[in-house]
């Protein structure tokens, strides 16, 4: 006991770091490295050593930084780190849970009864047993020489600060080197993998729950700020729900860089959409995006017309359709192969999982960052919400460059392909790879539809922008005033299940959609808000839905008046 009292705060931090970093992460180490014995390589061995060291050093780095608040505050904060990590380790060990935004959001719910349902006697016993030793160390130690004390003491400043900085560098540098090595493998194989550092951060204590907690806090602050600054259509307008919406599933697929003039269903010479061509309940439109870059389009494509400024940065003025549906009683989950966190938080989704977090799931470890991973997440979401009135948002990588990385080898139908970023591909090679990626988009959308084919469901798809693929111009993101037309060409689709069409009003709305699609009526991003509301059957007596933008609007009354 005397030794415990006498050791410095720095030594105690290191002992705690070993306990939290190694012992509490034991189950994760076993799952991540258990298969290495059967398929061992030097790089796998190096990554195992790096991750073991990183979990210890990042915890040490954190505990030393917390000592900047002084002895008393450090004891409290360090105790919280131990307790939170011990609690998280229970679910990671016995339930194989990946601690991410969704878990933190669930823990932070105001519905205490629901939170208590996942806390049993075994959890309490584990929490006590695992946290007892480190808590005894923390509260029986004198906490001599905190970082705050050392920085105030001449002769100790440089050395104490250097130790902390060195710990941070020893975490960052090896992980960065392994990330670079992984990128080389990606370029050589054409396989897209999640960020190595991101997966590590989302896999281990305490960085997983700390990053998720930070994301949750940022989302709450951002949401609160937006609630105060953005116009809320759900409060400004009256939305009247149809009688049969409570058992409905809504899925919105946000496409990436896919062009309608490279899709077979729109008359393209190559059959890039064989599966969608077989969907009888699909209405597909030649669409035009509101901008030419993902971040900009996400600002303007899901708000009411005029809900984003017409300035270069597309300043938001109103809340988006997903936030409105949330306020109208829909539960919602968002799964993304991208990382536009500002947009994801603005949807007010109950659960958000982005690419690194999805890649850290045990079932996905070692797999490419493939849009099909979102289908697995969607299955989980549907299973958790068996009663309907549920929204699922899927943000894909679609046909984003490098096109060849967007699809597995089995979809390499057109060759030669464009391999690598710096390979100086010809236009024909780029088009071959791009068209292969479109075929995989077709496969993905069809797979999503399969998940809700037997449910009362409606599925929307819209790509965020188009792409230039020619000798003069490549990619996208050209300022919209100067952008060529192909950067605005996006497919937009609506699919309704047979059960959804059993309702006469929905069947009538779909007939209108098919009529407009057959007439090749062009559609725009700015019509999505009103279309989603209208196709779900919502009405607004005070202007909350612009019927001119509602694709499902039946213009009978207008035609009668004209006659």
Curated annotation (Swiss-Prot):
Keywords: Cell inner membrane, Cell membrane, Lipid A biosynthesis, Lipid biosynthesis, Lipid metabolism, Lipopolysaccharide biosynthesis, Membrane, Transferase, Transmembrane, Transmembrane helix. It catalyses: alpha-Kdo-(2->4)-alpha-Kdo-(2->6)-lipid A (E. coli) + a 1,2-diacyl-sn-glycero-3-phosphoethanolamine = 7-O-[2-aminoethoxy(hydroxy)phosphoryl]-alpha-Kdo-(2->4)-alpha-Kdo-(2->6)-lipid A + a 1,2-diacyl-sn-glycerol; alpha-Kdo-(2->4)-alpha-Kdo-(2->6)-lipid IVA (E. coli) + a 1,2-diacyl-sn-glycero-3-phosphoethanolamine = 7-O-[2-aminoethoxy(hydroxy)phosphoryl]-alpha-Kdo-(2->4)-alpha-Kdo-(2->6)-lipid IVA (E. coli) + a 1,2-diacyl-sn-glycerol. Its EC number is 2.7.8.42. Gene3D superfamilies: Alkaline Phosphatase, subunit A (3.40.720.10). This is Kdo(2)-lipid A phosphoethanolamine 7''-transferase. Belongs to the phosphoethanolamine transferase family. EptB subfamily. It holds the Pfam family Sulfatase. Residues 1-9, 70-79, 139-159 are cytoplasmic. GO terms for biological process: lipid A biosynthetic process; lipopolysaccharide core region biosynthetic process. It comes from Escherichia coli (strain K12). PANTHER family: INNER MEMBRANE PROTEIN, KDO(2)-LIPID A PHOSPHOETHANOLAMINE 7''-TRANSFERASE. It is a multi-pass membrane protein. It is found in: Cell inner membrane. Its cofactor is Ca(2+). SUPFAM superfamilies: Alkaline phosphatase-like (SSF53649). Catalyzes the addition of a phosphoethanolamine (pEtN) moiety to the outer 3-deoxy-D-manno-octulosonic acid (Kdo) residue of a Kdo(2)-lipid A. Phosphatidylethanolamines with one unsaturated acyl group function as pEtN donors and the reaction releases diacylglycerol. Inhibited by calcium concentrations higher than 1 mM. It comes from the Bacteria. One of its GO terms (cellular component) is plasma membrane. The gene is eptB. One of its GO terms (molecular function) is phosphatidylethanolamine:Kdo2-lipid A phosphoethanolamine transferase activity.
């Amino acid at each position: 006991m005397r030794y415990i009292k006498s050791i410095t705060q720095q030594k105690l931090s290191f002992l705690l770091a070993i306990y939290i970093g190694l012992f509490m992460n034991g189950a994760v180490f076993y799952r991540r490295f258990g298969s290495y014995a059967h398929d061992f390589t030097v790089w796998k061995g190096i990554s195992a050593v790096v991750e073991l060291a990183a979990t210890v050093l990042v915890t040490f780095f954190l505990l030393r930084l917390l000592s900047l608040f002084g002895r008393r505050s450090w004891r409290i904060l360090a105790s919280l780190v131990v307790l939170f990590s011990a609690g998280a380790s229970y679910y990671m060990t016995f339930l194989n849970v990946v601690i991410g935004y969704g878990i933190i959001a669930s823990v932070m719910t105001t519905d205490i009864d629901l939170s208590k349902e996942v806390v049993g006697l075994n959890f309490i016993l584990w929490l006590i047993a695992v946290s007892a030793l480190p808590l005894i160390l923390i509260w029986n130690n004198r906490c001599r020489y905190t970082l705050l004390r050392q920085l105030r003491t001449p002769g100790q400043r440089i050395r104490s600060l250097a130790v902390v900085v060195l710990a941070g560098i020893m975490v960052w540098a090896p992980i960065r080197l392994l990330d670079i090595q992984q990128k080389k493998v990606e370029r050589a194989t054409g396989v897209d993998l999640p960020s190595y550092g991101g997966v590590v951060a989302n896999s281990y204590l305490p960085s997983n729950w700390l990053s998720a907690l930070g994301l949750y806090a940022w989302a709450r602050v951002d949401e609160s700020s937006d609630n105060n600054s953005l116009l809320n259509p759900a409060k400004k307008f009256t939305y009247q729900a149809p009688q049969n919406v409570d058992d409905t599933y809504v899925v919105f697929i946000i496409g990436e860089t896919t062009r309608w003039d490279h899709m077979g269903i729109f008359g393209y010479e190559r059959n890039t959409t064989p599966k969608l061509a077989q969907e009888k309940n699909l209405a597909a439109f030649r669409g035009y995006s509101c901008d030419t870059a993902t971040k900009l389009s996400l600002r303007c494509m899901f708000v009411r017309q005029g809900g984003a400024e017409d300035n270069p940065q597309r300043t938001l003025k109103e809340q988006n359709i997903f936030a409105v549906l949330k306020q109208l009683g829909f539960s919602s989950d968002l799964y993304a192969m991208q990382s536009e966190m500002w947009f994801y938080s603005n949807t007010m989704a109950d659960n958000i999982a982005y690419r690194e977090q999805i890649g850290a799931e045990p079932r996905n470890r070692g797999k490419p960052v493939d849009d099909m991973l979102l289908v697995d997440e969607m299955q989980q979401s549907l299973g958790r919400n068996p009663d309907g009135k549920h929204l699922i948002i899927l943000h894909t990588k679609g046909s984003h460059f490098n096109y060849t990385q967007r699809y597995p080898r089995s979809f390499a139908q057109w060759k030669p392909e464009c391999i690598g970023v710096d390979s100086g591909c010809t236009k024909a090679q780029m088009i071959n790879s791009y068209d292969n990626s479109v075929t995989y988009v077709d496969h993905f959308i069809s797979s999503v539809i399969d998940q809700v084919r037997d449910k009362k469901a409606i599925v929307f798809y819209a790509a965020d922008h188009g792409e230039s693929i020619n000798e003069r111009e490549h990619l996208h993101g050209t300022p919209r005033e100067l952008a060529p037309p192909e950067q605005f060409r996006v497919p937009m689709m609506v699919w309704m299940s047979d059960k959804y069409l059993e309702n006469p009003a929905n069947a009538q709305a779909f007939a209108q959609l098919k009529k407009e699609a057959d007439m090749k009526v062009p559609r725009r991003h700015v019509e999505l808000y009103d279309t989603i509301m209208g196709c779900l059957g919502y009405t607004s007596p005070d202007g909350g839905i612009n019927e001119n933008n509602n694709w499902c609007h039946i213009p009978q009354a207008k035609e009668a008046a004209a006659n």
